[in-house]
Amino acid sequence: MKTISIRDDVYRKLLEMKDEEDSFSDVIEKLLKRKKTDIRRYFGVLKDSEVLDEIEKSLNARKSARFRV
């Protein structure tokens, strides 16, 4: 076990993130794991999705729209 010093504002932010049963080490560990998340693991999750179809329709509609002044 080690002792570290942190600023008061950082302590308050960690405290806000902390669940009652969590230790501060748990909170810091969760934050470190988030940083390591590889965005490539989400590649293709919307494939064959109706949501993706709607997004594509919206983008195409925006591209073909003309500005009115």
Swiss-Prot record:
Q: Which InterPro entries match?
A: Put_antitoxin (IPR003847)
Q: What keywords tag this UniProt record?
A: Toxin-antitoxin system
This chain's function reads: Possibly the antitoxin component of a type II toxin-antitoxin (TA) system.
Protein name, entry field: Putative antitoxin AF_1481
Q: Which domain of life is it from?
A: Archaea
One Pfam family named in its UniProt record: VAPB_antitox
Family that this chain belongs to: Belongs to the UPF0330 family.
Keyword Chloroplast assigned: no
